[in-house]
Structures are given as C-alpha cells and as structure tokens.
Amino acid sequence: VDRIRNGRSFVTRRVVARQSDGAILNLSCSFQVHEEQADVQESTLPADVGEPGSGVVEDWDLLGRRIAHRSTGRSAIWLRVRDDLGDDPMMQACALAFTSDDIPTDSVGSTHPRIDEVHEDDIGYGDVFIGASLDHAIWFHRPLPVDEWLLHDHRSHGLANARGLSVGEVFAPSGAHVATVAQEILIRERTR
C-alpha cells in the first residue's frame, strides 16, 4: 500500500497486488471525511423494476438476486447480501464493491451475437466465452445498506474487439442513488 496523498478531508492510496508473473491488480482509492454539505440527486429509481426484492429469482450462495428487468444492453437486478453485515460503513462499502462486479457482465454480454446460444441451448456461459473484468470503478455517493435490497441498473455502452463497457447506478429501496459503477469487460469467444 502506497500513501499518495494525506489531506485534511481526503486521503489517496495505491495498492498493487502481485503473483509470480507480475502485477495482477492496480488499485487506486480515495477516502473522504464526511461533510455536511448540499445533497442533490439527479438520477431516479427506474419505474420498470418493481418492488425491492421482486423479479425472477437467481440466488447465489452469498447473494439474493432478483432479475427486475433484462433486455439487450440492460440488466436491472435487485441484489442483497444474505448475511447481516452490521452497521459498519466500511464493511457495507466493501460488500457493495464485491457485489458490483456481477451485473456489468450481464449487460454487456446480452449484446453479444452468440448470447442466444447460451440461453436457448442451455450451454454454460463459460463454454462459449472467456471473460474477465479489465477495469472497474466505483463512486460511493451516499451511505448504503448492502444487506437490504439494492437495485443495480447497468447499461452496455458497446462491445468491440472483445471488450465491452458497462455503466450502472445503484439505488436503495428509498430511491436514493447510493453509487455509480463503470466496468470494462473482456468477453472473448472460445476458439477451442
């Protein structure tokens, strides 16, 4: 961990994770002391996503997942961490970082010309594609209860050269816009 900046209200850190072949992760993060300032929200909870926790059930071991809206280029999914995380805001932020890696691949993958093969022929996604997160950014706007249902609403911005970009907003059930996520994703067709 490298200390990049220590200010009165902001600090910045850089982390490089390495394995035998070199760097596998470069992380830059900034932290801010809470400030009582204006709170203006322009984004709104979409009207087409139903009630928190409603939708088609696709639960995972650690996450409750409800598909609220899925179409070409868009995935809106209610997510909730199954365990009680308590009131620690850092633990809540870490849990959101963990959950935010899921939905961007759905939105970009839905635009791929071969995605129907995966759905119609009951073939596993990994049998057709190789995927990875290339770049991932999160902006935390407001306090968030990750052990409650949060709507992750992501839209694909395109897919070219085996890379896609997804940008999404995360909303609390109250409609509060709690975070914004952007992710560049590798979606490469398997050749063997």
What are these regions (language model features)?
Residues 2-192:
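Terminal targeting signals and extreme-terminal segments of soluble enzymes
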